[in-house]
């Protein structure tokens, strides 16, 4: 499965790890993704989604209305 948040669209980024000796190594920075079961009240069903930690905060504040739009 791809490592992309369904709500925010966050995906892996690429950059450098820099050591104390200033050696650069390429690194892949992964988003903080979690697989969650979310209850959609409008549709009366559970949906399994991959969301980032930021998306979990958004859903706790605003509810799952934005998520319901994606699954209609």
Curated annotation (Swiss-Prot):
SUPFAM superfamilies: L28p-like (SSF143800). GO terms for cellular component: ribonucleoprotein complex; ribosome. InterPro entries: Ribosomal_bL28, Ribosomal_bL28/bL31-like_sf, Ribosomal_bL28_bact-type, Ribosomal_bL28_sf. One of its GO terms (biological process) is translation. Keywords: Ribonucleoprotein, Ribosomal protein. One of its GO terms (molecular function) is structural constituent of ribosome. NCBIfam families: L28. Belongs to the bacterial ribosomal protein bL28 family. This is Large ribosomal subunit protein bL28. It comes from Prosthecochloris aestuarii (strain DSM 271 / SK 413).
